[in-house]
Amino acid sequence: MAEAGQRLVLAFDFGTRRIGVAVGNEMLGSATALAPLPARDGIPDWQQIAALLEEWQPDLLVVGLPLNMDGTESDMSRRARKFGNRLHGRFGKPVEVFDERGSTRAAKRIARDAGHRGNYRDDGVDGIAAQLILESFFADDTFLQRMP
């Protein structure tokens, strides 16, 4: 595993139809959106995730946690936690969950500014949301305090 501060990190924006993915390096604090992964009722193609992990060899996985605006858990946040637990169980990688409130709204704004026509059902913003989650994770002071 890479030293703290130099790790490669993959982030996931959990969804029932698509799972956004982004990759980033904590030293740079920046992230890049990757192609989203299809899901069926929140169940991903685990072979695609295995291939992604094989390709990128991340040191850490981050799963966005879609809390309600008042900070309470939602059905989706419970499902996202379960997804994170399964990632850890299947692949043995450390997993952090991170508050993603507002990431989808911000991703839609970024997409609109770039010319997106607003059909998010067919042309989602999942990768952008995962990128924003990861960049926010890198910028979070509490994350820096938790680094080994």
Swiss-Prot record:
One of its GO terms (molecular function) is nuclease activity. GO terms for cellular component: cytosol. InterPro entries: RNaseH-like_sf, YqgF, YqgF/RNaseH-like_dom, YqgF/RNaseH-like_dom_sf. Its EC number is 3.1.-.-. Disulfide bonds: none annotated. Keywords: Cytoplasm, Hydrolase, Nuclease, Ribosome biogenesis. The keyword Nuclease applies. One of its GO terms (biological process) is rRNA 5'-end processing. It is found in: Cytoplasm. It holds the Pfam family RuvX. HAMAP family: Nuclease_YqgF. Could be a nuclease involved in processing of the 5'-end of pre-16S rRNA. Belongs to the YqgF nuclease family. This is Putative pre-16S rRNA nuclease. The lineage of its organism: Bacteria, Pseudomonadati, Pseudomonadota, Gammaproteobacteria, Oceanospirillales.
